[in-house]
Design a protein with these regions (language model features):
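Short alpha-helical segments that sit at the start of domains
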Residues: 1-16
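Intrinsically disordered, low-complexity basic tails/linkers immediately adjacent to helix-turn-helix/homeobox/MYB/SANT
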Residues: 64-78
Length: 94
């Protein structure tokens, strides 16, 4: 049987990304890197995983130079991140 804490540790960048985006409308990748402690390689793999699960969407804003890569939660991602925040609150209670 897999240890749930080990699974969470491996997915910590993924989970932190979703919690971080939960109260944001849309964020640039550079802002996410500046405002979180998620390592760059972990951030990119977390974004790909979350996109595959339809939890986030990405787009490029070309109106500014240099173009900015933007990330936001999908409706499914918002529901997921709210549940995740509930679970975190349960863990923090004791």
């Amino acid at each position: 049987m897999m240890d749930p804490l080990k699974v969470l540790e491996k997915q910590s960048g993924f989970l932190r990304l979703l919690v971080y985006l939960s109260d944001k409308k849309e964020k640039a990748l550079t802002e996410i890197l500046d405002e979180t402690d998620i390592p760059v390689h972990q951030l990119y793999s977390s974004i790909e995983k979350a996109k595959e699960l339809n939890l986030i969407k990405t787009r490029t804003d070309s109106r500014k130079y240099p173009p900015r890569n933007l990330v936001s939660l999908t409706a499914k991602g918002k529901r997921f991140s709210k549940k995740l925040e509930e679970l975190i609150r349960i863990l923090e209670k004791d």
